[in-house]
């Protein structure tokens, strides 16, 4: 079984508080990956970066003082047609940090042969969760499609992909 993890493809990361040009171009690629995963009876998992109103007083908020993905705001929602693609059998994980230990626990329980990650942003949440997935499932294939994730800085994107390759995550 394959698990597809769509990382933080949320309004605030596409065209909201921390959005950047080009993030919207991932929408169709992600939709195609979701459809492909479902066609092989895989498990689709979405993560949502999730903060409260007190975000600016948190450790992350003090280092990145841009309120974003505040639960209950439009910026917290999945972006565009990806939001419409969520089905009842999908799993949605709200995470208060870059990486999700809840995702690690879930992946251990599901024990997929392959975990593919896509979404935003490559050099923060995608890399964090890819490393967590590899640690949770050291014998499973963990992949990241370079064309299905992005970040505002193309050089940071490439550096993150290089780090992932270095820890035996397959960058395709």
Identify the residue ranges that each predicted region occupies.
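Secondary-structure boundary elements
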Residues: 38-40, 113-114, 136, 140
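Conserved N-terminal glycine/acidic-rich loop preference
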Residues: 92-128, 150-172
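Short, charged helix-to-loop "capping" segments that act as catalytic/coupling loops
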Residues: 87, 131-144
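Histidine-anchored nucleotide/phosphate-binding helix
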Residues: 32-36, 127-137
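Short beta-strands and strand-loop turn motifs
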Residues: 118, 142-147
